[in-house]
C-alpha cells in the first residue's frame, strides 16, 4: 500500500519596502516574492489549474473576430492573455508602450511582472519610473533598465526622451 505524503508550506506575507541601495520598492522581503510564488504554483497541480481557470475567466470569450488583430506584431488575444495571467498570478501587470518619431503610440507589450519593480517617488509622491531586470538576485550580471511611466501627453513624452526641457 502506497503512503501519501503532504507538506504544509508557510507562505510569507508579501512585504513591500523601500530599498535604498537598489532605489526600488521591493517585491517581498527578499525581493523575490513573484519568483517564489511562481515556483510554488508550478509545483502544485491545483494552483496551476486554478490560475489557468481564472486567466480564462478574465479573458472570457475574447474579442471575437478581433482576436487575430496584431498590435506591434502580437495578436490582441495573446496580449490579453499575458495581461490576464499577470493579474491572476501577481495582482498586477506592467505594459510597455513605445512611441514613434512623431510621439504617437506605435506598439505595446506586456513586460514580465517578475522582472519589474517600481522606482522612487518624486516630490509630489508620484512613482514615475519602472525598473526592469531579468534577475533581481544577480543585478551585477543583469543590467537594470529604467522606463518612464506612461503619460499620453506628447510634451511629457518629449521631455522624458530629452527633446525638450521642462
Identify the residue ranges that each predicted region occupies.
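Structured, contiguous alpha/beta core segments that scaffold functional sites
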Residues: 1-166
